[in-house]
């Protein structure tokens, strides 16, 4: 009777660690979902990142100070630049710190920083259509003048709501800043006044909405915070971990499953982590305690838990079977 028992034991143990295909398979994740390295030697101060919905697996970035108003399309598979876009119709950029994509594949670029320590009475946002063909080209942009309701601010974080197209800015303040809300639609005539709404307790260097607009993440140099959008009644949910260093950029992958966090410098890495909470375009991700929490219920955590539970059940079954065979 030993051979049947051994066969049954093997079958039970195999079954214990078997998981559904949906749990073991990541599916067709967008390129860049595991992170990548920006290899273009022209990109040494990547200060913003935006995942393209028009070209899945492509990520738009820019330097905070460059030789001109340039955007770079980076392939998330190779880390190579596949297109450089020059903006026409705008003045000389001062300190370009952020980029986001709104409805209709409209790219918004935030020239909102103060790299030179100057308190500007106004800053600029540029809007342009995302090119349908990825090649080096010049695209005409619209330039918007931006002012803050409570005076000049230094800022590096700009968000564009993926459903409404409304633009938000978070000022950079060591003691924490605020989320500033822009007009429902930006105007190219006159100043667009941004008003403070909820406080953001972080020295923010970038921020991004999830693809469904249900949450947004704010990152700094030493940590991050994520918020539930909650239909505009914003709720702070918890902290997220970030890679240490000159961290300047953040975006969600287009499937809403990963949060990508980038750095400045030559050959700058972009690291991926599960989205916090259960927001994002396709749900999933870790719990509210943060992206890298050891107790998170990301896809890997679920798989391990399923296997562990199965192992316990299998061992219990084996003990029962052994007793049964002994009786025979």
Locate the predicted segments by residue.
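Sequence/structural signature of beta-propeller domains
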Residues: 2-15, 20-328
């Amino acid at each position: 009777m030993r051979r049947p028992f051994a066969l049954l034991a093997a079958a039970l143990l195999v079954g214990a660690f078997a998981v559904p295909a949906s749990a073991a398979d990541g599916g067709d994740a967008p390129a860049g979902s595991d992170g990548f390295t920006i290899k273009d030697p022209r990109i040494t101060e990547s200060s913003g990142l935006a995942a393209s919905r028009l070209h899945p697996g492509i990520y738009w970035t820019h330097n905070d100070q460059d030789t001109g108003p340039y955007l770079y399309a980076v392939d998330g598979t190779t880390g190579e630049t596949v297109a450089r876009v020059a903006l026409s119709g705008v003045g000389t950029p001062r300190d370009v710190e952020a980029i986001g994509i709104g409805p209709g594949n409209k790219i918004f670029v935030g020239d909102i920083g103060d790299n030179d320590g100057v308190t500007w009475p106004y800053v600029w946002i540029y809007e342009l259509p995302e090119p349908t063909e990825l090649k080096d080209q010049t695209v005409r942009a619209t330039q918007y003048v931006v002012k803050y309701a409570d005076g000049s601010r230094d800022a590096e974080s700009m968000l564009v709501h993926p459903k409404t197209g409304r633009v938000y800015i978070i000022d950079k303040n060591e003691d924490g800043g605020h989320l500033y809300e822009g007009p429902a639609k930006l105007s190219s005539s006159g100043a667009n006044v941004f008003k403070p709404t909820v406080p953001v307790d972080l020295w923010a260097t970038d921020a991004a909405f999830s693809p469904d607009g249900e949450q947004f993440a704010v990152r700094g140099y030493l940590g991050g915070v994520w918020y539930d959008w909650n239909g505009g009644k914003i709720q702070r949910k918890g902290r997220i971990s970030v890679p240490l260093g000159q961290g300047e950029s953040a975006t969600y992958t287009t499937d809403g499953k990963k949060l990508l966090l980038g750095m400045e410098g030559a050959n700058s890495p972009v690291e991926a982590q599960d989205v916090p909470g259960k927001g994002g375009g396709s749900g999933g991700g870790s719990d509210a305690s943060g992206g890298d929490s050891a107790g998170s219920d990301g896809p890997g955590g679920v798989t391990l838990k399923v296997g562990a539970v199965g192992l316990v059940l299998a061992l219990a079954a084996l003990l029962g079977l052994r007793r049964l065979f002994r009786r025979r």
